């Protein structure tokens, strides 16, 4: 049985950060286990190619489960009035399905979903964090989590009290100026206010997203947090390795049994499995 101080199950968005932070202590031995492969596929790193990742065996293709007790029929609403650019108005019917499902892909590769998502950088709404704190979750108010957002990012677009510089995660403006994007934002501004920064003091409105990219390439959690430290002597990374069983001692996860394409391994943590 191979022993480590910490075993991290899942080399996704959070797992890569944990591996980075825990191995800052040279006396701490860490093992990171990811069921997917290394993030070598060029489709991951070229931003425009994320639309083609669906067939690359790097994604868990989940669907949401329809809510119970909803009708199976398609419900019709009243007609909607649509105006074109020439001022002509059309009336079209609207309908929706109560039993509809939503496609929810998740990454199966180093970096997890941060390696396969659309790279949009949008923080949660302040109200949500403050509400969590009001419910009794100490340390989760927006004021308390903001320093960690700032610590994580290197924002190329904004430099103020709400944004950070020098962090591992690069946040940039979109490099491609698509005129149709500007047309869409202009149209949206007719019914809602413009907002140049969804992560600023006001988080609502219509505008252009910031993206997690650096020098025109995806800046995933693996790129930002894992690649710079992957050669640390106190870090072991297993890819293409699936954890089959987590073993507990009382309420603490202490060891895992995992299988790869070439071996079956039993790993134990002195501290805990995360």
Where are these regions (language model features)?
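N-terminal redox-cofactor-binding region of secreted/periplasmic oxidoreductases
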Residues: 1-268
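A short, hydrophobic C-terminal helix/tail in secreted or cell-surface proteins
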Residues: 269-274
């Amino acid at each position: 049985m191979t022993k480590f101080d910490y075993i991290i199950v899942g080399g996704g968005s959070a797992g890569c950060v944990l591996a980075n932070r825990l191995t800052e202590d040279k006396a701490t031995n860490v093992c990171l286990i990811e069921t997917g492969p290394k993030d070598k596929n060029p489709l991951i790193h070229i931003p425009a190619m994320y639309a083609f990742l669906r067939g690359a065996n790097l994604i868990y293709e989940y669907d949401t489960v329809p809510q119970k007790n909803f009708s199976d029929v398609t419900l019709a609403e009243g007609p909607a009035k649509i105006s074109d650019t020439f001022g002509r108005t059309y009336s079209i019917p609207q309908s929706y399905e109560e039993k509809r499902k939503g496609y929810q892909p998740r990454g199966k590769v180093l970096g997890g979903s941060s390696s396969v998502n659309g790279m949009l950088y949008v923080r949660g709404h302040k109200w949500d964090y403050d509400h969590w704190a009001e419910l009794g979750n100490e340390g989760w108010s927006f004021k308390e989590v903001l320093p960690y957002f700032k610590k994580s990012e290197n924002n190329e677009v904004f430099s103020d009290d709400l944004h950070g510089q020098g962090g591992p995660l690069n946040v940039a403006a979109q490099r491609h100026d698509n005129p149709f994007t500007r047309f869409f934002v202009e149209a949206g501004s007719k019914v809602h206010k413009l907002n140049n920064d969804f992560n600023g003091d006001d988080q609502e409105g219509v505008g252009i997203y910031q993206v997690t990219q650096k020098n025109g390439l995806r800046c995933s959690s693996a790129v930002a947090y894992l690649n710079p430290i992957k050669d640390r002597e106190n870090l072991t990374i297993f890819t293409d390795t699936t954890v089959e069983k987590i073993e507990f001692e009382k309420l603490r996860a202490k060891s895992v049994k995992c299988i790869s394409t070439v071996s079956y391994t039993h790993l134990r943590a002195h501290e805990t499995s995360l």
